[in-house]
């Protein structure tokens, strides 16, 4: 607080940067963000977590080792058989998981429309339950329906665990864990770029495995 008050006193001087209004406005913006961080409380809503990126949100993961992550919510669609990433989207505002499923499936459908592939079954975690009416024509399978699933569907549900290492590789090998682009548009471009890099590396491994190189 002492440094902020000292800077504010100097900015109120009549001779302070009269020929640089842009620099003054930028300085006022940083001072406003610093004051917001200084005065916010633990239980406040819409807290500011990063000076350089006010769009950063706190995401509760529910894991003992890492209960919270800071950034923007992302959703990934992975193919069942080969593990290719069919869609990657960001959702500012930290919406409920079930409300983003239709948007993610729309992106995956647009990407695969030239392959004459129709997405009929969706295997997801419990966060996507209760949204069947919002996704007509799609069979949503999750472990909340385990007792009513067929043996084949139970196998699909076990196969769904393969998406977790795919997300881990996106974060560790393709730099999805930290976005260096600015704003919501930068977050969206970063997610798509990481997914494209993942698929390119998958394709290079397939070429080497089949001896086509």
Question: Where are the language model's segments positioned?
Answer:
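Polybasic low-complexity intrinsically disordered regions
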Residues: 1-120, 124-126, 133, 197
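Composition- and surface-driven signal marking solvent-exposed, interaction-prone regions
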Residues: 88-91, 135-136, 181-184, 207-212
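Hydrophobic (often cysteine-bearing) scaffold residues that line and stabilize catalytic clefts
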Residues: 97, 101, 159, 189-192
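Helix-centered, glycine/charged polyanion-binding patches within enzymatic domains
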Residues: 113-189
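A short, flexible helix-boundary coil/loop motif
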Residues: 172-173, 177-179, 202-213
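Charge-patterned, long linear interaction tracts outside catalytic cores
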Residues: 194-201
């Amino acid at each position: 607080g002492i440094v902020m008050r000292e800077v504010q006193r100097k900015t109120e001087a009549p001779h302070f940067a009269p020929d640089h209004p842009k620099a003054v406005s930028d300085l006022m913006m940083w001072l406003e963000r610093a004051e917001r961080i200084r005065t916010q409380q633990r239980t406040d809503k819409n807290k500011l977590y990063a000076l350089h990126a006010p769009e950063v949100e706190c995401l509760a993961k529910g894991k003992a080792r890492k209960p919270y992550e800071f950034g923007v919510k992302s959703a990934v669609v992975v193919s069942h058989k080969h593990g290719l990433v069919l869609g990657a989207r960001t959702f500012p505002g930290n919406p409920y998981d079930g409300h983003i499923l239709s948007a993610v499936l729309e992106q995956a459908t647009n990407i695969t429309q030239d392959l004459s592939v129709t997405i009929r079954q969706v295997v997801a975690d419990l966060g996507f339950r209760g949204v069947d009416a919002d996704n007509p024509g799609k069979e949503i399978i999750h472990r909340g329906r385990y007792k009513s699933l067929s043996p084949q569907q139970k196998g699909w549900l076990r196969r769904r665990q393969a998406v977790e290492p795919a997300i881990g590789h996106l974060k560790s090998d393709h730099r999805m864990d930290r976005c260096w682009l600015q704003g919501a548009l930068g977050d969206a471009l970063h997610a798509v770029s990481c997914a494209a890099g993942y698929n390119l590396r998958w394709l290079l491994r397939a070429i080497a495995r089949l001896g086509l190189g």
